[in-house]
């Protein structure tokens, strides 16, 4: 049975002090978890240190929103794997649509980040994939998404794929209030799982975690999680307040 992964992506919100207050509220409330349930939060880089202290010893994992594919060097504004590990980061989001759009990250760059991350002891790397509204309207969703999956996982071995979480985030649903219907989301998740089977094996595809991201909230999370190929959620705005994030968690538990 696959685990359920709920990850809160705080993007460029909160100072370190603000983030630590929210993190502490979440960690305090989430006292017990089933073995098949994982909760993660990803504050801004500047808040990693304080948040790490706030959730130490709790059931909450600490994540980062991005990472360089270089170990060190002349990369102004970037952050290396070892820098993240120093703060206790256990997973990293890679290939988020906002990084693809605003930072010009290509499938090739994202693949380099995946391969670099696998050389370090992160528990999980989350590979984000998704299509634009124009691509969906042109019936190119599966072509676009599966191509991103293949390019993102290029060179990833079968032994390493167990540390990869895939996150389907339709770009047209991120921060817009629009959400893919459970049927639309399940169709893409099922296609991703079948693609993983082609690339690796049925055993791998049966066990790979695939999250959904795109205006997830307490009202729609339950029906999304009830779909057979949706194993969790990558949550943006609804994870920024402890109350709304906890409501999502309680609706899934």
Curated annotation (Swiss-Prot):
Q: Name one GO biological process term.
A: glycolytic process
Q: What is a GO molecular function of this protein?
A: triose-phosphate isomerase activity
The answer to keyword Cytoplasm applying to this record is yes
- The catalytic activity of this protein is classed by the Enzyme Commission as 5.3.1.1
Q: Which reaction does it catalyse?
A: D-glyceraldehyde 3-phosphate = dihydroxyacetone phosphate
Q: Which residues bind substrate?
A: 9-11, 175, 215, 236-237
Q: What class of enzyme is it?
A: isomerase
Pathway assigned in UniProt: Carbohydrate biosynthesis; gluconeogenesis; Carbohydrate degradation; glycolysis; D-glyceraldehyde 3-phosphate from glycerone phosphate: step 1/1
Active-site residues? Answer: 96 (electrophile), 169 (proton acceptor)
Q: Which UniProt keywords apply?
A: Cytoplasm, Gluconeogenesis, Glycolysis, Isomerase
Q: Please state where this protein is localized.
A: Cytoplasm
Q: Which GO terms describe its cellular component?
A: cytosol
Keyword Metal-binding annotated: no
Q: Which HAMAP family match?
A: TIM_B
Give the function comment from the record: Involved in the gluconeogenesis. Catalyzes stereospecifically the conversion of dihydroxyacetone phosphate (DHAP) to D-glyceraldehyde-3-phosphate (G3P).
Subunit structure of this chain's protein: Homodimer.
Q: What is the name of this protein?
A: Triosephosphate isomerase
Q: Which organism is it from?
A: Borrelia garinii subsp. bavariensis (strain ATCC BAA-2496 / DSM 23469 / PBi) (Borreliella bavariensis)
Q: Which gene encodes it?
A: tpiA
């Amino acid at each position: 049975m696959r685990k359920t992964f709920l990850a809160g992506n705080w993007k460029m919100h909160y100072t370190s002090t603000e983030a630590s207050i929210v993190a502490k509220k979440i960690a305090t409330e989430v006292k017990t978890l089933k073995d098949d349930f994982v909760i993660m939060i990803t504050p801004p880089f500047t808040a990693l240190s304080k948040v790490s202290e706030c959730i130490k010893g709790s059931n909450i994992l600490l994540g980062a929103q991005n990472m360089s594919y270089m170990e060190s060097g002349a990369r102004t504004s970037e952050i290396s794997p070892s820098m993240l590990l120093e703060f206790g980061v256990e997973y990293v989001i890679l290939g988020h649509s906002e990084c693809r759009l605003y930072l010009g990250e290509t499938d090739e760059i994202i693949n380099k980040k995946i391969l670099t991350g696998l050389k370090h002891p992160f528990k999980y790397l989350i590979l984000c994939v998704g299509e634009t509204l124009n691509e969906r309207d042109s019936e190119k969703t599966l072509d676009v998404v599966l191509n991103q999956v293949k390019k993102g996982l290029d060179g990833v071995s079968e032994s390493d794929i167990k540390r990869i979480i895939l996150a389907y985030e339709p770009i047209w649903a991120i921060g817009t209030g629009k959400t893919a219907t459970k049927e639309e989301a399940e169709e893409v998740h099922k296609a991703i799982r079948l693609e993983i089977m082609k690339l690796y094996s049925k055993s791998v595809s049966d066990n790979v975690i695939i999250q959904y991201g795109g205006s997830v909230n307490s009202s729609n999370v339950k029906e999304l999680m009830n779909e057979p190929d949706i194993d969790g959620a990558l949550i943006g705005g609804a994870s920024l307040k402890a109350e709304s994030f906890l409501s999502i968690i309680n609706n899934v538990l």
